[in-house]
Amino acid sequence: MIDNILFDLIEREAKRERENIELIASENFVSSDVRQAVGSVLTNKYAEGYPSKRYYGGCSVVDDIENLAISRAMELFGASYANVQPHSGSQANMAAIMSLIKPGDKILGMELSHGGHLTHGSKVSFSGMFFDAYSYGVSRDSEMIDYDDVKNIAKACRPNLIIAGASSYSREIDFKKFREIANEVSAYLLCDIAHTAGLVATGFHNSPIDVAHLTTSTTHKTLRGPRGGLILAGKEFNTMINYNNKERTLDSAVNSCVFPGTQGGPLMHVIAGKAVAFKEALNKEFKDYISRVIENTKAMAEYFISEGLRIVSGGTDNHLFLVDLSGLGITGADAEKILESVNITLNKNAIPFDSKNPSVASGIRIGAPAITSRGLNRDDSIKVAHFIIRALKTKSTDELRKIKQEVIGFISSFDMP
């Protein structure tokens, strides 16, 4: 029996995606091959454990699939080790953190309101509940990471683990400087490249793989794969560490912390989708795509600046940027609602040293991965920025209706992947 109610809802979502300009920096559109893999019969298979070490029979095919995903991930990032089982970036971070340190140890991560992530020490996350969390932020003047300040904080709190990475920071992060700081205070270094993995894989950003003890990522966002997580290691993969009161290699500790430590059976259909996405990212076309993402992001940021709006840190080096809306006299929450009414989707976002509650926020976050996947170029991206400014400045309901129709007509001319 066909579930008409559910499939009608899915079709409504497909229509929404076709007719909306998608600017949420953490979202993207996967290929039909990725969707086919994720929607395959592999969803039927339980496969607790790892290839050749399963707790169930009938795993020979999924062993080959997981090994394929692992080998492609290692090739893509130049890694010596990869675990493709984490269900999400947050679960990848949980496993990575808990393989390196124990509950009660000290973590130093980027302040959430300055661009960090919940799993980097926020009190509402496991990382802040189970660990003694400290934070670093950006300079009030430059709104960029001040590495001397990070060093001073690290010397003061002596963390067991330093986390480098962000969810709303528009500048390239110097992972080598973070490793120097970690070495100085005898801390482990975890680099979270969930947002910039596509830029790292294609060489547009420096790679932390052989710099950090562990690197984590999501497999969606700029990697354009299915929603999921990934843990990588470079030359530190066989470093001996104390895990659960036993001396073992880092890769072995991570494997144990993913399963059985924090997860049960892996999602084999999603791992297959990851394998497809890694293969796609190894092609030259993907590097061209990331180049266009960066170009489109910079074009939008520059247009906002030319129209008198302030961009946090003055610009962007990656796939996203933050707009301070204080000059327009509206909040991020206001802007999110206004723009959704004209079929432009993005999110409200706190800006550094924001005086407003995060649920209201003074800014918005804008990203170009999804629109670039639909084929928008630099000029198209500037047009998108123009739509946004028109919508945020108008006081006319009729004008908003007009903008919505223009947006639908414009974005509908671009195919979905």
UniProtKB/Swiss-Prot annotation:
(6S)-5,6,7,8-tetrahydrofolate binds at residues 112, 116-118, 247. The record marks 220 as: Plays an important role in substrate specificity. Pathway: One-carbon metabolism; tetrahydrofolate interconversion; Amino-acid biosynthesis; glycine biosynthesis; glycine from L-serine: step 1/1. Its EC number is 2.1.2.1. Keywords: Amino-acid biosynthesis, Cytoplasm, One-carbon metabolism, Pyridoxal phosphate, Transferase. The modification N6-(pyridoxal phosphate)lysine is found at residue 221. It is an enzyme of class 2 (transferase). One of its GO terms (cellular component) is cytosol. InterPro entries: PyrdxlP-dep_Trfase (IPR015424), PyrdxlP-dep_Trfase_major (IPR015421), PyrdxlP-dep_Trfase_small (IPR015422), Ser_HO-MeTrfase (IPR001085), Ser_HO-MeTrfase-like (IPR049943), Ser_HO-MeTrfase_PLP_BS (IPR019798), SHMT-like_dom (IPR039429). GO terms for molecular function: glycine hydroxymethyltransferase activity; pyridoxal phosphate binding. Gene3D superfamilies: Aspartate Aminotransferase, domain 1, Type I PLP-dependent aspartate aminotransferase-like (Major domain). SUPFAM superfamilies: PLP-dependent transferases (SSF53383). It catalyses: (6R)-5,10-methylene-5,6,7,8-tetrahydrofolate + glycine + H2O = (6S)-5,6,7,8-tetrahydrofolate + L-serine. It is found in: Cytoplasm. Its cofactor is pyridoxal 5'-phosphate. GO terms for biological process: glycine biosynthetic process from serine; tetrahydrofolate interconversion. Homodimer. Belongs to the SHMT family. Catalyzes the reversible interconversion of serine and glycine with tetrahydrofolate (THF) serving as the one-carbon carrier. This reaction serves as the major source of one-carbon groups required for the biosynthesis of purines, thymidylate, methionine, and other important biomolecules. Also exhibits THF-independent aldolase activity toward beta-hydroxyamino acids, producing glycine and aldehydes, via a retro-aldol mechanism. This is Serine hydroxymethyltransferase. The lineage of its organism: Bacteria, Pseudomonadati, Spirochaetota, Spirochaetia, Spirochaetales.
